[in-house]
Curated annotation (Swiss-Prot):
This is Evasin P672. GO terms for cellular component: extracellular region. Disulfide bonds join 70-110, 87-115, 105-124. It is found in: Secreted. GO terms for biological process: negative regulation of chemokine activity. The lineage of its organism: Eukaryota, Metazoa, Ecdysozoa, Arthropoda, Chelicerata. The N-terminal region is required for binding to CCL8. Pfam families: EVA_Class_A. Keywords: Disulfide bond, Glycoprotein, Secreted, Signal. It comes from Rhipicephalus pulchellus.
Length: 125
């Protein structure tokens, strides 16, 4: 008989524990968005990042100022490559409106925040 009472008591305590946990969760759901959880605070860091390069036969090229605009759907920032990255030194705005048109562009290497032309050419689009 004592064994049955002990099992009954454990079941009642377990049920009370489950009920208190469920009540705490439902109370937290009613809280305003000002009290955001840690999961929501870090959610934006894991979104895909998109950076805007010019396409070419030698790979992605940075603009003449060697700064690429990047976004992850919540924030924008400039990604600057000071030295060593490929860039295009010639900007032709009339060609940028037709993104699928291939044209000959002058390429160079980023140095000190500017594109230094090395007198080589590539097909750009």
């Amino acid at each position: 008989m004592a064994h049955k009472i002990a099992i009954g008591l454990v079941c009642v305590l377990y049920a009370l524990h489950i009920m208190s946990a469920v009540c705490e969760v439902s109370e937290q759901e009613g809280v305003g968005e000002d009290n955001a959880t840690e999961d929501e605070d870090y959610e934006d860091f894991f979104k895909p990042v998109t950076c805007y390069f010019a396409n070419s036969t030698v790979g992605p090229l940075r603009p003449p100022n060697c700064t690429v605009v990047c976004t992850n759907n919540t924030a924008w920032w400039n990604d600057t490559k000071s030295d060593g990255g490929h860039c295009y030194s010639e900007y032709r705005p009339e060609k940028r409106t037709h993104s699928r048109e291939i044209y000959n562009c002058t390429i160079g290497v980023c140095g000190n925040g500017t594109c230094i032309a090395n007198h080589t050419y590539a097909d750009c689009w």
